[in-house]
Amino acid sequence: MPLSLYNTLTRHQEPFEPLEPGHVKMYCCGVTVYDYCHLGHARSYIVWDVVRRYLQWSGYQVRYVQNFTDIDDKILNRARQENSTMQAVSDRFIQAYHEDMQRLNILLADVYPKATDVIPEIIQLIQTLVDQGYAYAVDGDVYYAVDRFPDYGKLSGRQLEQMQAGASGRVDDTEPKKRHPLDFALWKAAKSEELSVYQPWDSPWGKGRPGWHIECSAMVRKELGHTIDIHCGGMDLIFPHHENEIAQSEAATRADLAHYWLHNGFVNIQGEKMSKSLGNFKTIRAFLNSGVDPMMLRLFVLQAHYRKPIDFSDETITAAQHSWQTLQEGLRFGYDYGQQLRWEDYQDSSFGDPACMRIPDSGAEIERFRAAMDDDLNTASAIAVLFELAKELRREGNLISHAGQPQLDPQELRSIWQTLVCLAQVLGLEVSPETEVTADDGLSEAEIEDLIQQRQAARKAKNYAEGDRIRNELKTKGITLIDQKDGSTKWIRD
């Protein structure tokens, strides 16, 4: 079955057919850089990172573009509050964005255009819309006339009279200069109170700065051309942002902006939509700095279908931690047991690198993984395949620790492990030789070994009661100790 994707534009799941065979042009709306990224951003960029990875794994050459909105009222307001400048604020949070995404193992985009990089292209695009009658200038501002574009509303499925102005929080629907409440700004005249934080740009309509929506239209056009394959973002961007992008770009070029529009679902916190007003707003860095493994967060996001809402709660995070431990143990299998199984390349520097592994193009697990991903990127079903492989490796690891040898042939185990590692990398789930497995209760390998040493010391001192207490404590936490004939102690997870 070929890859099929749910297209917001058509409201149907459709076979994916790129404009140019073997090549994909993909644009993702990036962040407005006035604050640290939150968990909603984490979900969105993890999802689109996986889409890109899967397309590349499937043989496509993907050009992936993701912008930064570095001109916006929110940035200007923060700059004024901090007695800083728009550029200083945006530079700081662009750097913070990259730090957060690196921790989440999100691949770098091919290019990160900024709105400030494309001011000439923005002005040219606005002029085209004015010349063609889709936009009008009033006192230094330029507005898009939504009633001039017959297809306005086709992405969100709304009629013009059903829409609510100001849905983005960036539009003043009471502005008397506008002909229609839904008309939106393409160019904003400079205001005296803003001049201390940014230098306005010259334009045919006077000094000012671009509006939010026109920035993306100009960046898509410059980096990818008039028509692209995939345009993606969060569901909150469907209206008005993506609706307005379509209106601008398609009015100017007379061509479809994108063939496939993909949108990920919302993030809820303890059952409520995450928002600053409710006080349940969580940033990525604060969440990860609390001790959460970034790969666990990534796994948590991918265990739900990308179009459905997900709920961050104590219960769901705990469940995800348990799931990551299981998968982590499977991914570490080669590092933990490769030498004991006498895999010939164990000492090679490339050992464990998925790019250097040779796995078959077909096989039951690979075909099931591919079928899941081809079905509108069903990562939940794809991860179920990974868990089956990881649990099998976990059982074999317990046998090696307990009996000294596995049940399966070492080369068969090697094939299972390499398949798991390679498929997990398609989802961006990775470990390294230095990765330390953390038990469900929070005990690290080092902590377990320390307790074992305490037990051995107690037994050496003939304090058998203390030794039994430590053994029982570990047992309640899912750790079984196996005393060896030579006096050493091995441990396995139950």
Swiss-Prot record:
Entry similarity comment: Belongs to the class-I aminoacyl-tRNA synthetase family.
HAMAP family from the UniProt entry: Cys_tRNA_synth
SMART domains per the UniProt record, alphabetical: DALR_2
Positions annotated to bind ATP: K276
GO process terms (BP): cysteinyl-tRNA aminoacylation
GO molecular function: ATP binding; cysteine-tRNA ligase activity; zinc ion binding
Organism for this UniProt entry: Cyanothece sp. (strain PCC 7425 / ATCC 29141)
Alphabetized UniProt keyword annotations: Aminoacyl-tRNA synthetase, ATP-binding, Cytoplasm, Ligase, Metal-binding, Nucleotide-binding, Protein biosynthesis, Zinc
Subcellular location as annotated: Cytoplasm
Short sequence motif 'HIGH' region: positions: 31-41
Presence of keyword Iron: no
Cysteine pairs bridged by disulfides in the record: none
Top-level EC class as recorded in UniProt: ligase
Identification of the protein by name: Cysteine--tRNA ligase
EC number(s) given by UniProt: 6.1.1.16
Record note on cofactor: Binds 1 zinc ion per subunit.
Domain of life: Bacteria
Reaction(s) catalysed by this chain's protein: tRNA(Cys) + L-cysteine + ATP = L-cysteinyl-tRNA(Cys) + AMP + diphosphate
Assembly and interaction partners: Monomer.
Short sequence motif 'KMSKS' region: positions: 273-277
NCBIfam families: cysS
Gene3D superfamilies, sorted: Cysteine-tRNA ligase, C-terminal anti-codon recognition domain, HUPs
